[in-house]
Every structure is written in C-alpha cells, then in structure tokens.
Amino acid sequence: MTTVHDLSSDTMTTAADRAARAIPPVWPLASSVAVNPFLGQTEEHLAQVSARLGRIGNVPVTMPPAHYAALIEDGTITDDDIASASAASRIDNAPDLAEIKRSAAVPFDRPEPHSTIADLAARMSGIDWPGILADRFGHWASGFFDQGQALWAAPRRRGAYDAWRQTATHDLTPEITGLTGFAQFVSETPDTAQEARLRAAKRLGLDDDMLETYLHQLLFSLGGWAQVARYHLWQAELSQTTDETIADLLTIRLLWEEALFLQYEDRIGDRWEATKTAHAQPVTPQRGEIINAILQEAWEHAVQRDLASTIAAPSPERGEDRPTLQAAFCIDVRSEVFRRALEAVNPGIQTLGFAGFFGLTASHKSFASDVDELRLPVLLNAGVTSTSTGENVTAEQTARFKARAKRAWGRFKLAAVSSFAFVEATGPIYAGKLVRDALNIGSDPHDYGPAPVLDPPLPLDAQIDAAETILRAMSLTTDFAPLVVLAGHGANVVNNPFASGLHCGACGGYAGDVNARLLAALLNTPDVRAGLADRGIDVPSDTLFLGALHDTTTDAITLFAKDHPSAAHDAGIAQAETWFAQAGTVTRAERALRLPRADGDADVDLRSRDWAETRPEWALAGCKAFIAAPRHRTAGKSLAGRAFLHDYDWKKDSDFSVLELIMTAPVVVASWISLQYYGSTVAPDVFGSGNKLLHNVTGGIGVVEGNGGTLRAGLPWQSVHEGEGYAHDPLRLSVCIEAPREAMTDILRRHDGVRALFDNRWLHLFALDASGQMAWRYTGDLEWSEMARDARISDDLDAAG
C-alpha cells in the first residue's frame, strides 16, 4: 500500500521549478548555439554531479578509468599532477596516490540509476513502457514544438498540457500495447497542470525529500524535448516574463507514471516504496566517483603544465611602426590558426581577438525577409535593430515573390494528395538540379545582400557611446592602421542540419558578417570619430574600417569593400586580399593535418560542398584554453587552434569594467562551448545527438535518430570522434587572464554564478604575471596559490635562450 503524504501545492510548484532549472536549454537548429549540459549543476563539484546524474540516469561525467590509466602509463599524467589534483579536491579523507593509481587500473562499476514507475512496470510486465512512452511523447511533441516543417500547425494557444490532453484522449496506442483505459484516464485528469501534478504526486505518495531528484529524473528522461521547453522558459525570462511549457511537460510525464502505477500497483508497490526511500537519501558520491574526478583534474593539470610552457616561450620582438593592417577576429579557437598564419605573412600585420558579435547586440532582418535574427549572445537581449533592405525596392519585392513561390512549391511537393504524384511526374526534371548542386553551378553562396543599417538609427550620442565602449573593450584606442578589418565568421556547408552550430556562437548561431559591417559603418561615420576624439580616442583620418567574413570551413576571407568605397584605399585593400589568400592557404594546410581523409589544403575546400561529408570542419573540437592578454603574449606561438584569444590590456582598463565584461560574458560563453564538447565526449549517449547518418530533422527544431522518439541535443558523434579516436580531449577550460588578482577576486565576489564555475572547477582560472607567465592559480573561495615553476618550463626556456 502506497504511503500518502500531505504534499502542499506550493511545495510541489517549488520542486517542479527546481527540476526545470536542472535541465539545460537547447536552441532550434536555425540558430543553434553551444549549451553547457551541466548548466543546472554548476553549484556542485564534479564528483557530486556524477552521483546526482548517476542516480537519475547512470550518466558518466568523466572518461572511464582506463583512459586515465593510459595517460599515467605514457607519462602524460605524473604523480605530482595526481597529488596536486587530490589536494585541490578539498575532500576529507581524500584517497592517497597509491589508491588512486590502483583504482585507475580497474573498471569502475557505476551504481544502477533509481527506477521510474515506467521502469518497474516494464520489468514486471515485459512491456517496454519507457520505450513506448518515449515514442508516444515524441510523436506528440514533434508536432507541438514544430517551427514550420509540418504542413498543419498543432494547436498551442492553451499550452502544452491542454494540447497533449486533446491528443492523448484519441491516441489508442498505449491501450493497444497494454495500458488499459489510458485515454479515459487522461480525459479525467484535472483541467490545470498544477492540479494534475499535485494529484499525481499524492497518488504516488511523493514526499518533500524525494522530489528533488525524482522530478529531475522525469524531465531528464524526456531528453531534448525537456530542453526545448527549457529554452522557452529561458527566452521568456530574458523578456521579464515566464513560460509554463516545461512545467506542463513534467506534468505529462508524471501522469504517465500515475497511469502505470494505477495498473501495476499490486505488483510494484514494494519496489516503489524502496525507490522512494532511495530518492530521499542525500546525494553522496562514491569512492570511485571521487577518484575519477581527481584523475580528470590531474589530466587537466598536465595539460595546463604544457600550456604554461607554451605561453612562457619567448615572443617575437614587437615593431614600433604603425601597423600596415589590423584585422580583428572572433575569439573563436578557429581564428587562432588563421591569425597566426596572417601575422606570419607580413610582420606589419597586427591581429586582435574580440567577441564575434563586435559589441552590437542586433536583432536583424535580412534582405527580403521579415524574420528577426537575434545576432547576439544568448545571455543578452537585443540592443539595436537592423535591416539589409537596401535601396533597390524592386529587387527586394522580386526576391520576396520568389521566396513565396518557393515556399508554396515546397508545400505542394509535401502535401498528402500531391506528394506521390509529384515524384512520379517531375522526378526526372530534378536530375539537372542534382548535377548543378553537386558541382556548385549556378548558385552564389557568397551573396550576403546589401550593407546592413541600423533601423531606426541610434542618436549620435548613443553611437559615440557604443563606439567608445567597443573600442575600449577591444583595447584598440591608439595606433590605428590605415586599414582595419573587422572579420566576423561563419561556415559554408551543404546538407548539414547542424550548419548554424558552425557559425558564430556569440552571434546566436548566425554568421558574424552583419555585426562586423554594422560596426565598420559606425566607426567610419565622421561625427562619431569627432565624438571619439573628444573622449581621447583619436582615429586617424586615413583609417578605413571594413567589415569582413571569415569562412571557417574554407578559410576564405570576404571583404565588404563596396560598403565603403575609397579610392585612396584600393591598393591597400587589394594587398590585404592577397595576404588573406596566402594566410588561408597556410591555414588550410594546417587544418588538413587534423581532418580525416584530407591530403592538403585543396581537400579542405571540397569538403564544404560534399553532401556526404559528416566532418566538413572540426569547429571548436579540441578547445582547452581561454587567454585574455595583449596579443604579444601569444604571438608566434602555436596554440594549435585550441585556444580562445581575447585581446585585453588591463593597464588601459582603469576601472576594470572591461575585465568584468570579459569574465561575465565571453568567458561564460566559452565555458558553454567547452562543456558541450566535454559532455558530448564523456557521455555521448546522453549529452550528444548521436550518429549523423541516422538523423532526421523533426519540426525544424532538432534531430531524432530514426523515425521518432527522443529529441537528441548536443553534438553529433562525428563532431568529437574522427572514426578511430577522439578528436576532442574532454578538458574543462583553463582561463588565463593578465590582470591583477585583486581585480579578478572582486569580480568573482560580485558575481555568484561566475564564481561557482571556478569554485566548483567547471573552469580553471589563472593569473598571468607581468612577464606574461601563468603565475597564480585560483583555488576557490576567493583564494589563490602561487604556481611552482615547473622544471620542464625552465628547461624549455633555457633551451630557447
């Protein structure tokens, strides 16, 4: 007999909200960005999260012990690394070196997750209730969340709970498979989701102590569907409102539990009571989970030692002359390779790193489109609106008519009546189109439309404020070159549902060309320059800013020179295009060494047009460090396309407002990227989106493997694995900043969320000293420890001298 507890509505609502916030959001495919899969667990350390996720889904959060054993065997991880990692864990009765090394040599038996009622019913009946539930829920959710892929839109006006009830009362599949009277059960549920949750909780005998992990488990079992709903809540809260979709999904999942319990209570009652007792116990990591977390940290210490050695190597002498060309790129790790190659082409070239949205949080309408593209970090709201309408009204109207005709034709092809006849009648006509598409004939992937403009324009004072803020954040206030290129980045691929994930994360999953062109226009405005001069930023009259786009798939640079025609700069622009082309050749050759089946730089370009290519580029695979310092600290040093590089000169940042911006925005975005790759590598079945070869796009929002079921979020397996080995080492990001420790400590003290990332080791923080070396390690609780000068670093420096 189930014990009934007096559970209040407020308690249940609070628990449901906590469960919702334990789920990370996922953005739609059209504007997908990397998301930290551990977003709801950053207040806990790795071993604790291992225990929590193990309880609800047997989710690994580190590599298996054998992985670390191999690194110990080959000398990558030293005894000192293990000892320092163990000390950093701050765990009472921490395992000693011998115990840790013994544990690395044997497999760790992870405890089984607690069972849901669906799991218990499946064991008792032999019916795959979790699978049936996933199938029926996915069938409904793909229609409810559809963003235009379906021909008929599902009703959403009254929310997810009401929409599901309307569908479930007519879906006989659960009853056919053995859940007697399910449609009738759904029809008799309370009219509001809140009442239904409370009724189900009381029938199941839930109490306060077990709600935290049990409700989290139910949402977790819905996979990407819960993450889509969490995205709706995220977007609503950015607009200072709220959204009940994820709470509705929790209610639906809880009602499935209630229905199954009513049918199988006499057979699973005792087991369910034991499960409730287990859920009520504190979440405590096992010894093996603690040791795995220490081994993970030891590996990161080893990598940090090598990073310190690279940064400590001598840098080339800096010239005092005015730069011939300045090129600002996104901090994205893919820019590191190109920047290094470009600087090697000509010593007069200076490159800079800055967030790829270039400080302009734009809601943009592309040419002949009314769709609002949020080209900004997902942590922020739009601050300006822009459009690429252009002055040619006739051309825009023609483009709109063509787009409408294309949409109508597409719907005709997919309609129930016409689809089969269409294939029979017109299939041969498409042979020519297939050939043209395969050979890239007759299309212009580089048609970026007219120059974007702010609409409405900002007042002059606001323009000057924005320009000053951005230039100071870039540490670019003096020594301007005659030509300053602002290069956003994007990707150029075909037949790839994840194309937006290859674009700029700081631009919300869009390319960064619009933001770069908007900033160039702002900085070329004479009145803005006059205002900047009054504020101590004197831009020479012969300096021209140009927007550009760095295609990270082909490493081609497109300069938008027509945005700002200048005969005086024609020769300089032509020379810059030559330098960019030379740097692109060098970059492609280096990237080809990492890409499977790529023999040289020519193969890199071909991959972008190959329909069957599952790895057109590695995107941010391999990312391991974030460095905010003057460029000369890293110039001439190969970071192998694995470091985010943000220019920052703390001596120009008197109030440390730029430092605060870096630590609370770009660093957080980089952590989302790093931890998405981490999660998709250590737990690909949970935090990854599976095999690209099996993907089907559903609803325009995400992918499923096969023809339905759970929505898959995260990175595809092909994005972290090259077929024979890992393309990404799952390492938590090492953040290296050249700034006073006191200033960083003060920022951490005022930003609890950022501090939690460092205190709980989701990120590592290092302070660079006056010589640019990694000198201090942040150890948590606003404390720092001085780093010992590693012998290998000394040897490297002596050899270099």
Swiss-Prot record:
Superkingdom field: Bacteria
Signal peptide start-end: none
Cofactor: Zn(2+)
Subcellular location: Cell inner membrane
Keywords, ordered alphabetically: Cell inner membrane, Cell membrane, Membrane, Metal-binding, Transport, Zinc
One example GO MF annotation: zinc ion binding
Sequence positions that bind Zn(2+): 330, 332, 489, 504
Membrane topology term: Peripheral membrane protein
HAMAP family, sorted: DabA
Subunit structure: Forms a complex with DabB.
Protein role: Part of an energy-coupled inorganic carbon pump.
Family in the record: Belongs to the inorganic carbon transporter (TC 9.A.2) DabA family.
Name of the molecule in the record: Probable inorganic carbon transporter subunit DabA
